[in-house]
């Protein structure tokens, strides 16, 4: 039996400014590490921002409704 923990996905939030966490082409491994450090299962660079999969349900992600950029 496989248990799926957290299924939210979205852009990684830069808490310092409320924007999406920026990235450049070729920085997928960096985004993957950053996403995992914020409780996501994996991530990649969806230029120009890091996109993460498998956030836990209580994780904070970038949200268009509260966008401050």
Curated annotation (Swiss-Prot):
Q: What is its main location?
A: secreted
Tell me which UniProt keywords the record has, alphabetically. Answer: Disulfide bond, Ion channel impairing toxin, Neurotoxin, Secreted, Signal, Toxin, Voltage-gated sodium channel impairing toxin
**Disulfide cysteine pairs (residue numbers):** 19-69, 23-45, 31-50, 35-52
**Signal sequence extent:** 1-7
The record, for InterPro entries, names:
LCN-type_CS_alpha_beta_dom, Scorpion_toxin-like, Scorpion_toxin-like_sf, Scorpion_toxinL, Scorpion_toxinL/defensin
Cross-referenced CDD domains: neurotoxins_LC_scorpion (cd23106)
What are the subcellular locations of this protein? Secreted
Instruction: Tell me which residues make up the LCN-type CS-alpha/beta domain.
Output: 8-69
UniProt tissue specificity: Expressed by the venom gland.
GO BP:
defense response
Decide whether keyword Transferase is in the record: no
MF terms per GO, please?
sodium channel inhibitor activity; toxin activity
The answer on whether this UniProt entry bears the keyword Signal reads: yes
* GO CC terms: extracellular region
Supply the Pfam families for this chain. Toxin_3 (PF00537)
Q: Outline what the protein does.
A: Beta toxins bind voltage-independently at site-4 of sodium channels (Nav) and shift the voltage of activation toward more negative potentials thereby affecting sodium channel activation and promoting spontaneous and repetitive firing.
The similarity comment for this entry is: Belongs to the long (4 C-C) scorpion toxin superfamily. Sodium channel inhibitor family. Beta subfamily.
Instruction: Let me see what the UniProt entry remarks about domains.
Output: Has the structural arrangement of an alpha-helix connected to antiparallel beta-sheets by disulfide bonds (CS-alpha/beta).
Remarks, miscellaneous: Negative results: does not affect the cardiac Nav1.5/SCN5A, the peripheral nerve channel Nav1.7/SCN9A, and the voltage-dependent potassium channel Kv1.5/KCNA5.
Q: What is this protein called?
A: Toxin Tz2
| Organism from which the protein derives | Tityus zulianus
């Amino acid at each position: 039996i496989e248990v799926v923990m957290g299924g939210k996905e979205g852009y990684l939030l830069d808490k310092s400014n409320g924007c999406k966490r920026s990235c450049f082409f070729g920085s997928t491994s960096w985004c993957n590490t950053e996403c995992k450090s914020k409780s996501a299962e994996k991530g990649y660079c969806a230029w120009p921002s890091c996109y993460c999969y498998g956030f836990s349900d209580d994780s904070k992600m970038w949200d268009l409704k509260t966008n401050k950029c």
